[in-house]
Swiss-Prot record:
Cellular component annotations (GO), alphabetically ordered: perikaryon; presynapse
WD repeats: 101-142, 156-195, 242-279, 281-320, 365-406
Tissues with expression: Expressed in several neurons in the head, tail and ventral cord, but absent in touch receptor neurons in adults. Expressed in GABAergic and cholinergic motor neurons.
Disruption phenotype: Temperature-sensitive phenotype with defective touch receptor neuron synaptic transmission conferring variable degrees of touch insensitivity amongst individual animals. Touch receptor neurons and GABAergic motor neurons have mis-localized presynaptic vesicles as indicated by aberrant expression of the protein snb-1 and distorted cell bodies. Reduced rate of inhibitory postsynaptic currents at the neuromuscular junctions of GABAergic motor neurons. No effects on cholinergic synaptic transmission or snb-1 distribution in cholinergic motor neurons.
Entry function: Plays a role in mechanosensory transduction (touch sensitivity), touch receptor neuron development and synapse formation. Regulates expression of the protein snb-1 and the distribution of synaptic vesicles at synapses to promote synaptic transmission at the neuromuscular junctions of GABAergic motor neurons.
Protein name: F-box/WD repeat-containing protein mec-15
SMART domains: FBOX, WD40
Gene name linked to the record: mec-15
Top-rank taxon, per record: Eukaryota
Record domain F-box: where: 6-53
PANTHER family: F-BOX_WD REPEAT-CONTAINING PROTEIN MEC-15, WD40 REPEAT PROTEIN 12, 37
Ranges that cross the membrane: none
Length: 406
């Protein structure tokens, strides 16, 4: 090429530009580079560019049910995988904080943000709810000037607290307990925990979700019941007992209510017709200990140490992989499968697997010192919280802040 033919980046062949783009910071590639010129914008908004990177760089094959979901975008999917791999490069690269405070097993943790601040709610077998400030835990020791627990209710329930769920549009949240009640709560402007309502569902209440229809909360019980509660009147307005034993896992999306029980049945029931299941599966060897629903996919953990991914539209099995002797919890996150499992040596680890139908392990923790009960993960803050059997909570914080991601 002579001096009479100046080289300009914009004049390079598209194939070469696509290759060069893979070396740029991913956030910049999505938010800034498309604004440089029309040609860059065209290349970086082409679904084929991102789909190819998902297959070749991430080595992920996504199921058809996700690809056909109306909210699926290859660019967002690739970036979600990139963020997860960056977050979990190695377990040792993060900051792990052990937070004492409860006096019994912490069966429920729930991360959320309010006014650009990070918080965690925890519920325990000591019948107490605590509200934790993640910023204060990150900033230093738990002192009177820097309290980690910013609010608590020592008499929240008269039995063990099993689960929590929060409304997406407010600071209202819900709790279930061994005392057979479901309670609604509000975090006031000054940070206090205010009990709003309570309803008795007849037996120990287990799972809870408010991700279905507006103004409805769905819960399950140990006495085979799945109940729908009107959040305005806080009364049970519909229920079914299609399971034969305790209902221990729940996932809800719109009118679709997915449950699994100790009877080894997994089913989907339409909210508009509780008389019979639309879909069901019976497993002769193991029950599903957890359900996680996203983009037409249902990720399940099993009592015999497996993780199974289903097409939520028809219960077709998309993949199965083994993670130990017992899978405590599975979490289907944009860009990854998050798994808590017990090994054959009866030690627990937290693992991250690639999404899609050919999952590979990306990262794993060391053997956890305390037996975990439940975890939650916040994709916006990239924070992991683990409630433990020794009454502590682990807050696992990323090495870099979200605004420092590449």
């Amino acid at each position: 090429m002579t001096n009479a033919q100046p080289t300009e980046l914009i004049s390079l062949p598209s194939e070469l530009l696509c290759h060069l783009f893979t070396y740029l910071p991913q956030r910049q590639l999505i938010t800034e580079i498309p604004l440089v010129c029309r040609r860059f914008n065209t290349i970086l908004n082409d679904d084929k560019f991102w789909s190819r990177r998902i297959r070749t760089e991430q080595k992920v094959r996504l199921p058809d049910c996700e690809l056909k979901h109306p909210e699926y975008e290859p660019k967002k999917s690739f970036y979600a995988m990139h963020r997860q791999r960056d977050r979990w490069r190695a377990w040792e690269t993060q900051t792990v904080i052990t937070a004492p405070g409860h006096s019994a097993t912490v069966d429920s943790v729930m991360l959320f943000e309010n006014n650009n601040k990070q918080f965690c709610l925890s519920g325990s077998r000591d019948r107490t709810i605590r509200l934790w400030s993640i910023e204060n835990a990150r900033n230093g020791e738990d002192t009177e000037q820097n309290p980690w627990t910013v609010a608590k209710d020592d008499t929240a329930h008269s039995g063990w607290i099993w689960n929590m769920a929060q409304e997406s549009t407010s600071t209202n949240f819900y709790t279930t307990s061994w005392d057979s009640t479901v309670k609604s709560w509000h975090i006031t402007d000054n940070g206090a925990l205010q009990n709003l309502n309570s309803v008795n569902v007849g037996s120990a209440a287990q799972c809870i979700s408010c991700s279905g229809n507006e103004n409805e909360v769905v819960c399950t019980t140990f006495a085979k019941r799945v109940a729908v509660i009107d959040s305005r009147t806080f009364q049970v307005v519909a229920d079914h007992k299609l399971h034969k034993r305790a209902v221990i896992a729940l996932a809800v999306q719109g009118d679709k209510i997915f449950t699994s029980g100790e009877d080894r049945l997994m089913m989907m029931v339409d909210r508009r017709n509780f008389s019979k299941p639309v879909l069901f599966e019976y497993s002769p060897t193991a029950y599903k200990s957890c359900l996680s629903l996203q983009c037409n996919q249902l990720l399940t953990s099993t009592s015999d140490g497996k993780v199974k991914l289903y097409d939520a539209n028809n219960f077709n099995v998309l993949q199965t992989y083994s993670v130990g002797s017992y899978t405590r919890q599975s979490f289907l996150e944009h860009g990854a499968h998050l798994i808590m499992a017990r090994s054959l040596k009866r030690n627990y680890t937290f693992s991250i697997y690639s999404p899609g139908t050919r999952s590979q392990q990306w990262c794993a923790s060391h053997e956890l010192a305390a037996e975990p009960a439940k975890f939650d993960y916040s994709p916006s803050s990239r924070t992991l919280a683990i409630g433990n059997g020794d009454s502590s909570i682990l807050f696992c914080l990323p090495a870099s802040a979200p605004d420092q991601e590449n």
